[in-house]
Amino acid sequence: MEKYHGLEKIGEGTYGVVYKAQNNYGETFALKKIRLEKEDEGIPSTAIREISILKELKHSNIVKLYDVIHTKKRLILVFEHLDQDLKKLLDVCDGGLESVTAKSFLLQLLSGIAYCHEHRVLHRDLKPQNLLINREGELKIADFGLARAFGIPVRKYTHEVVTLWYRAPDILMGSKKYSTPIDIWSVGCIFAEMVNGRPLFPGVSETDQLMRIFRILGTPNSANWPSVTELPKYDPDFIVYEPLPWETFLKGLDDTGIDLLSKMLRLDPNQRITAKEALQHAYFKESS
């Protein structure tokens, strides 16, 4: 820690306190002091292993992990620092982002996700708060892989991995299969929020979250999602909703944008588009 000074607390993240600090050359960093669930046990070796993988991730749309400082009792991750996040930006942009900005952010988000998925690293907790933005309009994804390294704190169940509003229906119904589609669902929710200026599914509980999804996208059944009936929390007595036309709840998104979003927000995870496929979509070929 001697290398860093001028510590200024800038927030409390999912995993602990975040500080802004400078090194001896005047460069600014974000220091994430990881909160350990069991203080007396020290840092789990699995966490160290996962973090060492994150140091290898090098992509312009992923927040760079520069350094890992670990003593017996604590772990500090040293990341590059960015001043703004997407949530703060959306809070001040009434009615959503301009279409050219939303498209640029989505393209960068998918580029970072595709890179990590190719390296077999999932995010599992994507939300506007951990998409950081700099003054040049560059977007970088923060907290990649931390869900796997440390688990999502305070929750006792491994399937509770994504902040409620961005959580995929398969996870909400108890699926333990963590794979790349859970991140794609979150990306779709973020895309819709950038366009609309408000969350698409702002649920207050897991059940409410599912019902909000079904009210818009329709209630799944074995015809449109063959394995849905096998999920632990599937209920044959779910209220049956018909899907709404996309135009009714998405303002200002053209047909190709709606087509891309509809491929991300498929109820059945096996039918969701991959990040790599999404990058080739016609939505990115047209000029806004």
From Swiss-Prot:
What's the domain of life for this entry?
Answer: Eukaryota
Report the active site residues. Answer: 125 (proton acceptor)
Q: Single Gene Ontology BP term? A: cell division
Q: Which residues form the Protein kinase domain?
A: 4-284
Q: Does the keyword Flavoprotein apply?
A: no
Which top EC class applies here? Answer: transferase
Locate the residues binding ATP: 10-18, 32
Name any cofactors this protein relies on. Answer: Mg(2+)
The UniProt catalytic activity note for this protein reads: L-seryl-[protein] + ATP = O-phospho-L-seryl-[protein] + ADP + H(+); L-threonyl-[protein] + ATP = O-phospho-L-threonyl-[protein] + ADP + H(+); [DNA-directed RNA polymerase] + ATP = phospho-[DNA-directed RNA polymerase] + ADP + H(+)
Report a single Gene Ontology molecular function: cyclin-dependent protein serine/threonine kinase activity
The coiled-coil regions, if any, are none
Phosphothreonine modification sites?
14, 158
Keywords for this protein? ATP-binding, Cell cycle, Cell division, Cytoplasm, Kinase, Magnesium, Metal-binding, Mitosis, Nucleotide-binding, Phosphoprotein, Serine/threonine-protein kinase, Transferase
Classification via SUPFAM superfamilies? Protein kinase-like (PK-like)
Phosphotyrosine: which positions carry it? Answer: 15
**Localization in the cell:** Cytoplasm
Report the EC number(s), separated by commas if there are several.
2.7.11.22, 2.7.11.23
Describe regulators of its activity.
Answer: Phosphorylation at Thr-14 or Tyr-15 inactivates the enzyme, while phosphorylation at Thr-158 activates it.
Any one annotated GO CC term: nucleus
InterPro entries linked: CDK (IPR050108), Kinase-like_dom_sf (IPR011009), Prot_kinase_dom (IPR000719), Protein_kinase_ATP_BS (IPR017441), Ser/Thr_kinase_AS (IPR008271)
Q: What does this protein do?
A: Serine/threonine-protein kinase. Involved in the control of the cell cycle. Required for entry into S-phase and mitosis. Probable component of the kinase complex that phosphorylates the repetitive C-terminus of RNA polymerase II.
PANTHER family registered for this protein in UniProt? CELL DIVISION PROTEIN KINASE, CYCLIN-DEPENDENT KINASE 5
Instruction: Summarize subunit and interaction data from the UniProt record for this chain.
Output: May form a complex composed of at least the catalytic subunit CRK2 and a cyclin.
What is the protein's given name?
Cyclin-dependent kinase 2 homolog
